[in-house]
Regions:
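Ferredoxin-reductase
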Residues: 2-89, 145-147, 167-170
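FNR/FR-type flavoprotein reductase catalytic core
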Residues: 73-236
């Protein structure tokens, strides 16, 4: 098992009212791949410890990593990371973890990236890695969320021509799409044509992931080419 490493918070950036991005400097960080995640451990003064897993939001950059954390109700770890941890303070990190939900833009083929809510975090790592590598492999991003107030990486994604936003409860003024759940027809219209080279990556809450995965298979994507990452109330 990978050892725990000390990680110092060096910068923070608000994403929404309930989420922020943490930039951490990790001692002896070995590097990571787009789509991987880490385990975070907090230790209280009385010795009580709590652990949670969080996706990495950016590609490898020396000893720096980024995590985007959304506060969940009664979340003892997410609440502290969003509201309590201050620049200069330390937590413990273990990882990187995961080898299945990984897309390397320099090595792998085209990708359809589908995110629900905070499931955009590992997808963002993939997009940033693609931009950094300067490769032109076809990519489409479909990002489903409740309302504009839940949108992560607002400015960065606004400049992405390959992005389709699907709001389920409230849409911004002027949005031509009325609020509704993401449909199979939209996966077809805004995705990529199924092919042996294409891999689909789906990340979000369990119900969303199951629904989207089934829809992708129903429109012709090979089940083996649909990779998923899901989380629950006490997850990432």
């Amino acid at each position: 098992m990978t050892t725990w490493r000390a990680a110092e918070l060096v910068a923070v950036r608000a994403e929404t009212d309930t989420a922020r991005t943490l930039t951490l400097r990790v001692e002896r960080w070995p590097g990571h791949l787009p789509g991987q995640h880490v385990d975070v451990r907090l230790t209280a003064p009385d010795g009580y410890q709590a652990e949670r897993s969080y996706s990495l939001a950016s590609p490898a950059d020396g000893d720096l990593i980024e995590l985007t954390v959304q506060r969940v109700p009664d979340g003892e770890v997410s609440g502290y990371l969003v509201d309590g941890l201050e620049v200069g303070e330390r937590i413990e990190i273990r990882g990187p973890v995961g080898g299945w939900f990984v897309w390397n833009p320099e090595r792998d083929g085209p990708a359809l990236l589908v995110a629900g809510g905070s499931g955009i975090v590992p997808i963002m790592s993939m997009l940033r890695a693609r931009r950094r590598a300067g490769v032109g492999k076809p990519v489409r991003v479909i990002y489903a969320l409740r309302d504009p107030g839940q949108l992560f990486y607002r400015d960065e994604l606004a400049a992405d021509p390959d992005l389709f936003l699907a709001y389920s409860r409230a849409a911004p003024p002027g949005d031509p799409r009325p609020p509704a759940r993401l449909s199979g027809a939209e996966l077809t219209d805004h995705g990529l044509t199924p092919s042996p080279e294409l891999t689909c990556y789906v990340c979000g809450p369990t119900g969303f992931v199951e629904s989207v995965s089934a829809a992708l298979v129903s429109i012709g994507h090979e089940p083996a080419r649909v990779r998923t990452e899901r989380f629950g109330p006490s997850g990432r």
